[in-house]
């Protein structure tokens, strides 16, 4: 529950959560029941028990023709009226091997776009899916060989002799999707978007008009810039487009980013885009000195773009010499506080950014941000607590970035629990008011939070033991009342991120759409929940014709009106 702090106390009162106690993962007392797919005792539902083989099965490579033909499937229950005629899009890594070689990291997987179109009568859905046919994907598929270096360590065979001084990375187009202004874009935050046909999912090419850099088809290194002109053109440098744009009414708000190594700073440029892809207001630029890691996500309030800067260091030599991928040479700075940047929006009447330090934590996703009646900015994030001694030893100043995600599937025995944080900043005084893992959700392992105007947070829920495990259900946390509502998917099931879709005109609340994989049947389904009654379970379920790998992000394009995510 939000605690309002008086203005006089705001400068002096700082609430921070205590360091997470050392938690030992519980023994999987329910594993025999998981094997049998039988009922699990209530006390064991949220203990995080799972079979590693089940979890690894969610990262089996998907054959290219698995969903190539549109297939109409029956819906159990009824699709709500406001969703009928609309389309759920979901982007994800889906191919994890090439030429008999398994990729080093699931996030290096080739991007796959899923399309689920709901029928007008609410009883059927039509499913199709297709790989994003980037130029590297087509080339590697044709030769059945890994030909490009990847962000998280997958590299062509041949070692340094082949890979040294090759700094161009494969755009895997595997992270998110946006449907806006008649364009469907597959996003990957270290490159340019790829535009797809909204119905057939055929790849049309790179959307290089959205981020400055070399023209489509030319090999380039994005996320780096020197002069923004002739030098960049000669070296093939350019901007990257975020994988996390946000919708604000009739505008799509997004940013591009690029490191400027000679200045040692990260440069962001925010755009607010109309439905015809023109700028609603002039772009806003912002520099972050001494920043090694580009923001993965951002928030938006009436007056500010909100960015949480994670503190990290990078050792470029192993990457340049062809020994490691760029993510492998990143180290999280566990002793340094994060930085919250409040960047004035164009037309806000404000000019000076506000930058406030936050106690050490690592922000993963921004659920939402808003301004209260006193002008303070609230930011809800999912994050790792860097003071957790289980995963961040106190005697180490740095730890590897996403190292435990390598292998056939993310290894939750070595991944920190994702917790919900609420951070409050007073831009008038430039101070941090509070930063906490709110008590009602303390101990809940939550990820992919979404917040709406009613003050409710919906998120994937893994367990209530403060440990790390795959998502096995969903939670709704009411910021105003502190109440928490939960829903458990059942044994051997794994839940993807929720996609939030507003209810129809004249209705309050939201519908929640999610993919859930059942290891017992090796099947994936699309589930629709009422955001006001998530504990009641799905109101509609559409089985997919083929199981799909565990996905990342998606969006919903209604029959009429702008998309939601």
What do these predicted regions represent?
Residues 1-16:
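N-terminal chloroplast transit peptides
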Residues 12-14, 20, 58, 444:
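Residue-level detector of alpha-helical hydrophobic segments embedded in or interacting with membranes
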């Amino acid at each position: 529950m939000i605690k309002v702090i008086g203005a006089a106390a705001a400068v002096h009162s700082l609430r921070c959560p205590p360091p997470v106690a050392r938690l030992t993962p519980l023994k999987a007392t329910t594993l025999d029941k998981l094997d049998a797919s039988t009922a699990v005792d209530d006390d064991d539902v949220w203990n995080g028990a799972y079979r590693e083989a089940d979890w690894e099965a969610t990262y089996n490579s998907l054959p290219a023709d698995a969903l190539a033909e549109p297939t109409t499937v029956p819906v159990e229950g009824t699709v709500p009226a406001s969703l009928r005629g609309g389309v759920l899009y979901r982007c994800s890594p889906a191919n994890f091997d090439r030429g008999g070689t398994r990729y080093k990291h699931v996030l290096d997987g080739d991007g796959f776009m899923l399309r689920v179109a709901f029928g007008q009568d609410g009883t059927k859905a039509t499913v199709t899916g297709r790989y994003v046919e980037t130029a590297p994907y087509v080339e590697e598929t044709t030769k059945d060989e890994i030909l490009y270096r990847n962000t998280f360590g997958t590299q062509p065979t041949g070692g340094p002799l082949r890979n040294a001084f090759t700094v161009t990375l494969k755009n895997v187009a595997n992270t998110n999707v946006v449907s806006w202004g008649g364009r469907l874009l597959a996003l990957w935050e270290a490159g340019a978007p790829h535009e797809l046909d909204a119905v057939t999912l055929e790849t049309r090419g790179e959307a290089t008009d959205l981020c400055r850099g070399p023209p489509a088809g030319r090999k380039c290194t994005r996320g780096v810039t020197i002069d923004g002109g002739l030098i960049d053109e000669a070296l093939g440098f350019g901007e990257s487009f975020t994988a996390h744009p946000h919708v604000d009414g009739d505008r799509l708000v997004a940013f591009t980013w690029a490191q400027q190594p000679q200045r040692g700073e990260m440069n962001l440029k925010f755009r607010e885009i109309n439905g015809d892809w023109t700028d609603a207001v002039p772009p806003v630029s912002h520099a972050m000195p001494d920043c090694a890691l580009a923001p993965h996500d951002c928030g938006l309030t009436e007056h500010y773009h909100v960015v949480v800067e994670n503190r990290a260091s990078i050792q470029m030599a192993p990457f340049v010499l062809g020994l490691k991928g760029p993510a492998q040479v990143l180290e999280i700075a566990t002793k340094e506080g994060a930085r919250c940047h409040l960047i004035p929006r164009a037309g806000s009447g404000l000019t000076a950014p506000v930058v406030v330090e936050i106690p050490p934590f690592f922000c993963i996703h921004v659920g939402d941000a808003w301004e209260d009646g006193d002008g303070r900015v609230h930011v809800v994030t999912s994050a790792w607590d860097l003071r957790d001694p289980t995963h961040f030893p106190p005697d180490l100043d740095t730890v590897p970035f996403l190292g435990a995600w390598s292998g056939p599937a993310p290894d939750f025995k070595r991944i920190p629990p994702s917790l919900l944080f609420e951070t409050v900043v007073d831009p008038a005084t430039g101070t941090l008011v509070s930063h906490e893992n709110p008590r009602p959700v303390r101990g809940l392992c939550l990820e992919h939070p979404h917040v709406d105007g009613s003050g409710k947070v919906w998120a994937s829920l893994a367990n209530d033991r403060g440990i790390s495990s795959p998502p096995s259900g969903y939670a709704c946390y009411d910021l105003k009342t502190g109440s928490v509502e939960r829903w458990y998917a059942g044994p051997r099931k794994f839940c993807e991120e929720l996609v939030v879709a507003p209810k129809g005109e004249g209705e309050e609340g939201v519908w929640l759409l999610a993919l859930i994989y059942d290891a017992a049947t090796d099947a994936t389904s699309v589930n629709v929940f009422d955001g006001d009654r998530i504990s009641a379970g799905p109101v509609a379920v559409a089985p997919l014709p083929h199981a799909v790998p565990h996905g990342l992000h998606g969006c919903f394009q209604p029959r009429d009106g702008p998309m939601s995510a």
